Amino acid sequence: MNPEAVVNYLMEWSRQKVKEAGALGIVLGVSGGVDSAVAAIIAKKAFPENCMTLLLPCESDVVDRMDSQALVEKFNIPYRIIDLDNAYHLLSTQFESYLKCEGLKGKLLRGNIKSRLRMMALYYSAQARNYLVLGTSNKSELCVGYSTKYGDAGVDLQLLGDLLKREVYELAQFLGVPETIVNKPPSGGLWSGQTDEGEMGLTYEELDNYLASGDGSPEVINKIEGMMAGSQHKRKMPPVAMIPPELRN
């Protein structure tokens, strides 16, 4: 991969999509992870005067908060911090007052509340400014549905959606993303100790190898193909019940 050429292409692509939408710029969330770091730097390059980043802590790890702020300040990217803790606690308490799930399912439910709150904050900011919401998911995540429906998957543009995780790391090195971000285990930050690979039950190396070449152990291939099949609904618009013509007569 030619990192410089890819970055230039993504800059022009994002400008074209914003123009087509009649929008003025881009807003995105910065989490402290490598994907959002790469997306934020490219967005700033593409829209020097019309790029806004939101830091949206919600029971977030303090290291992620510090890394997020250090990144946007290093690259002189405009940002706002919107603490979602109070909104999250209010909603989760209300929801769990009538239906509470324990264990992993409970963690996933609560984590998805956080992701959807962030989506709401991003779209509020985008609509107020006539901006588009820029997603930060990579191809590896999108292919297996590793995202929250109407949460981090609720965006207008997926800048990194055709890049494998390892290719995102290549861009991160080229763009000068701080090592503190590049070297940390990828995590959605949905609960304490959560990591992408731990939740998926796969390493990104295994996933990227399969997506790039179809290679992998039988167990890995079966798992990936099962995840791809089970998450198709996340990559499609909701089905519409088409009324047969004879029922309209």
From Swiss-Prot:
MF terms in GO: ATP binding; glutaminase activity; metal ion binding; NAD+ synthase (glutamine-hydrolyzing) activity; NAD+ synthase activity
Catalytic reactions on record: deamido-NAD(+) + NH4(+) + ATP = AMP + diphosphate + NAD(+) + H(+)
Gene3D superfamilies registered for this protein in UniProt: HUPs
Domain of life: Bacteria
Residues reported to bind deamido-NAD(+): 116, 149, 156, 233-234
SUPFAM superfamilies with a match to the protein in the record: Adenine nucleotide alpha hydrolases-like
Subunit: Homodimer.
PANTHER family: GLUTAMINE-DEPENDENT NAD(+) SYNTHETASE, NH 3 /GLUTAMINE-DEPENDENT NAD + SYNTHETASE
Record protein name field: NH(3)-dependent NAD(+) synthetase
